[in-house]
Curated annotation (Swiss-Prot):
Location of the protein in the cell: Mitochondrion intermembrane space
Keywords, in A-Z order: Disulfide bond, Mitochondrion, Repeat
Species of provenance: Candida albicans (strain WO-1) (Yeast)
A cellular component term, taken from the record's GO annotations: mitochondrial intermembrane space
S-S pairs: C8-C39, C18-C29
Protein name: Cx9C motif-containing protein 4, mitochondrial
Record gene name: CMC4
Domain observations: The twin Cx9C motifs are involved in the recognition by the mitochondrial disulfide relay system.
Amino acid sequence: MSEVNETCKPQACAIQNCLEKNGYNESRCTKCIDDLYKCCKEFYERQGPDASSVCCPKFKLLQLKLKQRSLGEIDAKVLETRRG
């Protein structure tokens, strides 16, 4: 049986806690998300792009997310809807 790699688990859990505390408003958890992406980036730098952690996006997706974040505001926002 293979061992599950939980590298960056504290950062992933911090995102979950932040989202729960803030009504799942991702824009209020930017620092936690950035911390996870930083941890995952360092993980892939050490282990290589084929490494895997249940707490990190795949290498290519992480690269895309980091690029998007460097270009500006990309956090999801909670939109209020009117029912009427």
